[in-house]
Amino acid sequence: MELYEQTIHNLQTQLQARQVSSVEITNSFLDRIESTDQSINAFITVTKEQALLDAAAADQRIAAGNCAPLTGIPVALKDIFLTEGVRTTSASKMLDNFIAPYDATAWTRMKSQGAVLLGKLNQDEFAMGSSCENSAFGPTRNPWNKDHIPGGSSGGSAAAIAAQQAVATLGTDTGGSIRQPASHCGCVGLKPTYGRVSRYGVIAYASSLDQVGPMTRDVTDAALLLGVIAGYDPKDSTSVDCPVPDYTAALQQGVKGLTIGLPKEYFIDGLDADVQQAMEQAIAVYRQLGAEFVEVSLPHTNYAVATYYLIATAEASSNLARYEGVRFGHRAKDTAGLIDLMMQSRSEGFGAEVKRRIMLGTYALSSGYYDAYYIKAQKVRTLIQQDFNEAFRSVDLLLTPVAPTPAFRIGEKTADPLQMYLSDIFTIPVNLAGICGISVPAGISSNGLPIGLQLLGRPFGEETILRAAFDFEQATQWHTKKAAL
């Protein structure tokens, strides 16, 4: 097995035993990126020289007996995380040449534990999209079938795992942007509880919905990474001050005796036949493992997409007001005064989908429509949260599909924004409720594309969904399937 095919925990063991060096591992991934990324387009920036310097320094620390959980492990970040001295674009022309002056907290924590940065990953511009087609740097392609999308907005983060260009990546999840691409690319994607991981240094899309999480090859690595990045951060006012458990220790507990809820609103007519079959097979596996199932109802699910696209766009309208060509960001040339400068800079700097969402959000917040749209959406959001609270009174976790279909073809939905938005119908409610969710590989479609299973837990119930995901992973081995590049 090549070094680039392995997991964090396997590489850790070899590094600590001095069987391999971090420089060798890092070179293996850099060579893999060089040989495969022209056809995948997962990376916006590759930090080759710095990565090799950091890997050499990691080898020195290992030789001195100073080995942290991620020492010498090469990782990559969605290009929405600020990285000091490294270009951070959020896949937008607006930030094409922006060099961050400080690190995001999540990356600071990974770096403090010895991680080596391979580079920054492609995404939908400002995390607005479900297909990774809305990037100023071109679309990312799914390594399983390059005519298909990898999912979004963390499409590069998922594609890099599937193409074996990185052992682990970080993404962000605002309406499914970790879980949906993980499902489409056959990897593990964890969206933690809102407030579990600091958002400091993450370019904001919708501040009440955004959450940082890991994308990995298996559940053990996801648990390990979450343990590194989770925890209170005084720099993030939404960060929650509660203890961080040892997530890897809970993995072996299994699901025997757990009650799993099946939300009837998620198993609907129109669900792709391959997805339906994968869910039925997953339920059968869990029954064999000793879990019990009950049907539950989340009655306001049908309102989730509309609610999300009012709240998220309203917050985006506010967050993206700072990009006006004066303080930072793209600055238009040959303009007639300040107002024209701002208008031209934003017109040139933002892509079509970002402009669409800014306009939707500005409209929802405008005088005369604020109560009718934004306030009403916040009230429905509360009802969706209450639906989940009620469901968790009788179950330990929920099992659902991640997406209604496997990955669709590039360009298939770009002309129909509503159809694109509806592809996140099973992931959006989780962000509105602020709970945790994980996508794990659960099958392969008839046309050879991965299908993911979604497990949802109570707020700060990551241990439960991780142990359930691990039990399923060990019983099925879907996570060992690899894209043929």
From Swiss-Prot:
Keyword terms, alphabetized? ATP-binding, Ligase, Nucleotide-binding, Protein biosynthesis
Taxonomically, the superkingdom here is Bacteria
For this record, the Gene Ontology CC terms, alphabetical, are: glutamyl-tRNA(Gln) amidotransferase complex
| Catalytic activity from the UniProt record | L-glutamyl-tRNA(Gln) + L-glutamine + ATP + H2O = L-glutaminyl-tRNA(Gln) + L-glutamate + ADP + phosphate + H(+)
UniProt family annotation: Belongs to the amidase family. GatA subfamily.
PANTHER family annotated for this entry? GLUTAMYL-TRNA(GLN) AMIDOTRANSFERASE SUBUNIT A, TRANSAMIDASE
Q: What does this protein do?
A: Allows the formation of correctly charged Gln-tRNA(Gln) through the transamidation of misacylated Glu-tRNA(Gln) in organisms which lack glutaminyl-tRNA synthetase. The reaction takes place in the presence of glutamine and ATP through an activated gamma-phospho-Glu-tRNA(Gln).
| Protein name (Swiss-Prot/TrEMBL) | Glutamyl-tRNA(Gln) amidotransferase subunit A
What is the species of this protein? Trichlorobacter lovleyi (strain ATCC BAA-1151 / DSM 17278 / SZ)
Gene responsible for this protein: gatA
